[in-house]
Amino acid sequence: MTLLDPLANALSHITNSERVGKREIYIKPASKLIGEVLRVMQKYGYIGEFEFIDDGRAGVYRVQLLGRINKAGAIKPRFPVKATEYEKWEKRFLPAFEFGILIVSTSQGVMSHKEARDRGIGGRLIAYVY
């Protein structure tokens, strides 16, 4: 069976593991995009430490959970967003103003919508976390 969206699978695995109270999980297969999303989540305090483990195949991420995630999910389709439109998408995907983050893929890398808005750059929405 083929895995169609590894990012959506990883985020649902994180959400489900948080709900049952796990403290450490393994996400496979690993990818650069999943690693960048984990980095943004760690920067905002949603997860603890994470590390890449090379298993000779696609690799695995070991992630420490802190119990701070209510919901995390991938945004499909990957909507293009201008630098001035972030508020509209916040209202659509986040439960309250300034609560949670949208993760955006920009020409300057993967970052949160807050960081992208401060830099004045647009991109494509790839995930949300709150």
From Swiss-Prot:
Instruction: Please list the GO biological process terms of this entry.
Output: translation
Q: Name one GO molecular function term.
A: rRNA binding
What InterPro entries does its record include?
A: Ribosomal_uS8, Ribosomal_uS8_CS, Ribosomal_uS8_sf
Bridged cysteine pairs (disulfide): none
For this record, the Gene Ontology CC terms, alphabetical, are: ribonucleoprotein complex; ribosome
Which superkingdom? Archaea
In Pfam terms, one family for this protein is Ribosomal_S8
The alphabetical list of record keywords is: Ribonucleoprotein, Ribosomal protein, RNA-binding, rRNA-binding
Q: Which Gene3D superfamilies match?
A: 3.30.1370.30, 3.30.1490.10
Sum up the protein's function in the record's words.
One of the primary rRNA binding proteins, it binds directly to 16S rRNA central domain where it helps coordinate assembly of the platform of the 30S subunit.
Quaternary context: Part of the 30S ribosomal subunit.
The record's family statement is: Belongs to the universal ribosomal protein uS8 family.
What is the name attached to this protein's record?
Small ribosomal subunit protein uS8
